[in-house]
Curated annotation (Swiss-Prot):
This is Peroxygenase. Belongs to the caleosin family. Homodimer. GO terms for molecular function: calcium ion binding; heme binding; monooxygenase activity; plant seed peroxygenase activity; protein homodimerization activity. PANTHER family: CALEOSIN-RELATED FAMILY PROTEIN, PEROXYGENASE 3-RELATED. InterPro entries: Caleosin-related (IPR007736). Expressed in pollen (at protein level).
């Protein structure tokens, strides 16, 4: 009895633990799911990460940001963020406001010194300092990828399909992850998932699990850019 209780993931007096379930057998489906991965974004379907994706010895969070480093100098300026957003398929308006919001909000935390820069650069080697609250915690505080937290996105929130998220389910995800007294984190999380929804939703209005995983290591951005190039060449 005590042994069974020590492994329970739900509590009758805490209905939220029943509503938002976790996978108790995750370690049978993925080796060491609670071990943060520094180089690859893994899940139960991709235990070795994204096939063909080059990590470049960067953390998974750094890989996510590095796509927008268009000249590969380790620094992302607003105009590079704009070009990156355009490259994956966002229109000019979203790309313009997106680059302003992203660089203005993230730049200072990544700077090597205390003096702000009027160019709002984002330094990739310090991007872990810009991690905001009220997020999914799939990235840890050093920028590693935590597989168990990624799987929880779907076990806790996917109600229509186990491997897809609707817009309302994404909204609920951001509501569930809210930390107290963290309005900046609340807004940032909603903006991030809204942009992913615009970018990756399927014809039925769902974001597939593979697309969500791909955004964490940046492979989704690479896929979208290559797809757009191929379509233009046809």
């Amino acid at each position: 009895m005590a042994s069974n209780e020590s492994l329970q993931t739900t509590a009758a007096m805490a209905p939220v633990t029943i509503e938002r379930r976790v996978n108790p057998n995750l370690d049978d489906e993925l080796p060491k799911p609670f071990l943060p991965r520094a180089l690859v974004a893994v899940d139960t379907e991709h235990p070795s990460g994204t096939p063909g994706h080059q990590h470049g010895d960067m953390s998974v969070l750094q890989q996510h940001v590095a796509f927008f480093d268009r000249n590969n100098d380790g620094i992302v300026y607003p105009w590079e963020t704009f070009l990156g957003l355009r490259a994956v398929g966002f229109n000019i308006i979203i790309s313009f406001f997106g680059c302003l919001i992203i660089n203005i909000s993230l730049s200072y935390a990544t700077l090597p010194g205390w003096i702000p820069s009027p160019f709002f650069p984002i330094y990739i080697d310090r991007i872990h300092r810009a991690k905001h609250g009220s997020d999914s915690e799939v990235y840890d505080t050093e920028g590693r990828f935590v597989p168990s937290k990624f799987e929880e996105i779907f076990t806790k929130n996917a109600r229509t399909h186990p491997d897809k998220l609707s817009f309302s389910e994404l909204w609920n995800l951001t509501e569930h992850n809210r930390n107290a007294l963290d309005p900046l984190g609340w807004v940032a999380a909603k903006l991030e998932w809204f942009l992913l929804y615009l970018l990756a939703k399927d014809p039925h209005g769902f974001v597939p699990k593979e697309a969500a995983r791909g955004v964490f290591d940046g492979s989704l951005f690479e896929f979208c850019e290559k797809s757009r190039r191929s379509n233009k060449q046809q």
